[in-house]
C-alpha cells in the first residue's frame, strides 16, 4: 500500500491534517470558506469576520458561505457592516458570497437581551429589516442580489442551494422543479441556518422540525452545511453521514454548550433542570462558564473539493491555526464508504484516559451558588484526561455511588477549554456541587469519568469510602430578628 492509499484508507481518513493534507494533492477543483453565526452588530463587531475573509483570500477561495445569522439585531445597519467588510477584502474579485438568513436576521431586534444591548449602543428596532420593506428588499439593497426563499448559485460548475429562514417549506416544490439537475455523482452543497433534524449533534432541539431531511435523503451527493448550534468543532458529531452528508458549522462569534451540565448553559440563576437523574436539582452551586466574548472561538472551515473527496479543514480563525484534523468525505457519495455514519464513528472514536498515577482530590468548602446564596459544596479536583492527538475529551461525569446499590448521584461538567483548541485545555480540572445532594447515612464513593462526545467513558478515578451523617433536612435558614 502506498502512502497515498494509506492516508485515504477507511482507518486513516479522519486523521488527516487540514491544509497539510491538501498540500499532498495539489490544488482542488473548488475551495470555499465557511463561517456561521457571525452576529454583526456594530462596525467593530465585524473585525473577526473581516480577519476570516482575509485568511480565506490568502487561501485562494472561490466562495465564502455563511449559513445565517449575519446580524445579531436584524437591522439594516448590520447588513451594511457585513457588506463593507466583504468589500474591503473581496471588492474587484470573482469570489462569490454565499449568504443566507437566520433567525436573528429576521427577529433579533425583538429578543429581550439583544434589544437592551441594541438600545445601549444607539440602535433601535426602527431600523429592523422587517419594519423597512421586509427581508427581500433589504437583502437586495445591501447585497445587490435577488432574494428568494430557495435559490441556487453555481461556482466553478458546483451548485450551492440555500434555504432561507422561514423558507424551508418552499424547498419541496423547488426540488420538484429543479432536483433532477442535482442528481448524479458530482456533489452539490446545500446550506440553511437551522440544523437538519435527525443529523448532527444538536439537531434534535431548535431545528427545522424535520422538514428538510426527507427531501435531501433522495440526494446522496448532497453535502449540507448548517449553523445556529454554536457548537465548537471539538464535537465529532458535528459531521453526520446517512442518506446524505450534513455538517454543523461552529459560530464565529461565541460558543454555546449542550444542556445537562452543572457549569454549562442555562439560566444564570441556576434554576435549571431536570438533571441527568430526571430530577429537579437545587439551584446550581457552580457558576456557568462565561458566554459571548469569553467564549470566542472564532471557528470555521476551509472546504476543498476534488473529484474523489471533499476535505473539510477545521480552523481557529482567531488563532489562525488548524484547530483539529480535517474531515474527509469520500466521493462519489453514492458508492463510497461513509466514515461519518454515527454507528461507525461511535465505535471508532477514542475513549479518554486519565494520566498514570492520577488522583482525585476532594474537599468541602463554602461558596455562593448562582443565586448568590451561601452554599457548602463538594470540591472535586483532578488532572485533565488525555486523548490521542486529534481527539478531545467532551465532558466529565462525577458520580456519588452508594455502596448499597441504590441509585447514584450523577453530575456532568464541561472543561473550561471546551470551546477552544487543545492547547488551551487546562492541566487540571476543578468542579463542585452542593453537598445537600450527596447520599446521607450510607457509605458511598465518588467516581470521576472522562467522556468522549458519544458518551463512552474512561476508567474512573475513585475516592475512598465516605459516609455523610443524616440531618441536612433539619437545616433551616436563619430568621431575621427585629432589632
Language-model segments: residues:
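N-terminal export signals
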Residues: 5-22
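N-terminal active-site segment of His-dependent metallophosphoesterases
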Residues: 19-80
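A short C-terminal boundary segment appended to hydrolase-like catalytic domains
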Residues: 274-413, 461, 466-482
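Beta-strand-rich modules
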Residues: 438-455
Amino acid at each position: 500500500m502506498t502512502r497515498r492509499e494509506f492516508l485515504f484508507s477507511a482507518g486513516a481518513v479522519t486523521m488527516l491534517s487540514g491544509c497539510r493534507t491538501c498540500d499532498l494533492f495539489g490544488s482542488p477543483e473548488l475551495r470555499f470558506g465557511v463561517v456561521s453565526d457571525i452576529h454583526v452588530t456594530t462596525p467593530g463587531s465585524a473585525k473577526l469576520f473581516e480577519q476570516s475573509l482575509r485568511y480565506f483570500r490568502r487561501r485562494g477561495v472561490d466562495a465564502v458561505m455563511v449559513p445565517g445569522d449575519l446580524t445579531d439585531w436584524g437591522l439594516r445597519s448590520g447588513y451594511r457592516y457585513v457588506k463593507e467588510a466583504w468589500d474591503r477584502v473581496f471588492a474587484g474579485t470573482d469570489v462569490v458570497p454565499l449568504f443566507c438568513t437566520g433567525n436573528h436576521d429576521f427577529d433579533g431586534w425583538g429578543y429581550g437581551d439583544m434589544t437592551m444591548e441594541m438600545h445601549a449602543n444607539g440602535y433601535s428596532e426602527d431600523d429592523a429589516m422587517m419594519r423597512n420593506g421586509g427581508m427581500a428588499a433589504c437583502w437586495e439593497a445591501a447585497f445587490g442580489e435577488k432574494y428568494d426563499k430557495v435559490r441556487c448559485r453555481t461556482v466553478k460548475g458546483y451548485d450551492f442551494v440555500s434555504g432561507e429562514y422561514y423558507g424551508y417549506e418552499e424547498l419541496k416544490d423547488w426540488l420538484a422543479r429543479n432536483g433532477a439537475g442535482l442528481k448524479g455523482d458530482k456533489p452539490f452543497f446545500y446550506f440553511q441556518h437551522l440544523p437538519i433534524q435527525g443529523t448532527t449533534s444538536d439537531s434534535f432541539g431548535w431545528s427545522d422540525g424535520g422538514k428538510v431531511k426527507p427531501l435531501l435523503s433522495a440526494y446522496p451527493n448532497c453535502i449540507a452545511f448548517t449553523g445556529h448550534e454554536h457548537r465548537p468543532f471539538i464535537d465529532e458529531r458535528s459531521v453526520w453521514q446517512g442518506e446524505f452528508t450534513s455538517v454543523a458549522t461552529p459560530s464565529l462569534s461565541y460558543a454555546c454548550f449542550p444542556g445537562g451540565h452543572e457549569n454549562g448553559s442555562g439560566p444564570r440563576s441556576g434554576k435549571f433542570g431536570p438533571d441527568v437523574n430526571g430530577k429537579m436539582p437545587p439551584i446550581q452551586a457552580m457558576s456557568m462558564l462565561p458566554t459571548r466574548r469569553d467564549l470566542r472561538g472564532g471557528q470555521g472551515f476551509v472546504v476543498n473539493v476534488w473529484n474523489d473527496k471533499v476535505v473539510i479543514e477545521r480552523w481557529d480563525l482567531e488563532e489562525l491555526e488548524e484547530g483539529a484534523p480535517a474531515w474527509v468525505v469520500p466521493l462519489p457519495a453514492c458508492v463510497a464508504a461513509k466514515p461519518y455514519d454515527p454507528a461507525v464513528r461511535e465505535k471508532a472514536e477514542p475513549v479518554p484516559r486519565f494520566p498514570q498515577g492520577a488522583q482525585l482530590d476532594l474537599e468541602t468548602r463554602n461558596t455562593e451558588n448562582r443565586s448568590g446564596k451561601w452554599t457548602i459544596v463538594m470540591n472535586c479536583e483532578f488532572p485533565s484526561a488525555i486523548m490521542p492527538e486529534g481527539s478531545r475529551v467532551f465532558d466529565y461525569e462525577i458520580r456519588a455511588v452508594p455502596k448499597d446499590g441504590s441509585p447514584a448521584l450523577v453530575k456532568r461538567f464541561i472543561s473550561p477549554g471546551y470551546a477552544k483548541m487543545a492547547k488551551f485545555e487546562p492541566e487540571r480540572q476543578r468542579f463542585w456541587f452542593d453537598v445537600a445532594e450527596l447520599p446521607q447515612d450510607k457509605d458511598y464513593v465518588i467516581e470521576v469519568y472522562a467522556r468522549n462526545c458519544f458518551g463512552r467513558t474512561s476508567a474512573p478515578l475513585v475516592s475512598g469510602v465516605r459516609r455523610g451523617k443524616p440531618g441536612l433536612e433539619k437545616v433551616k435558614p436563619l430568621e431575621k430578628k427585629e432589632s
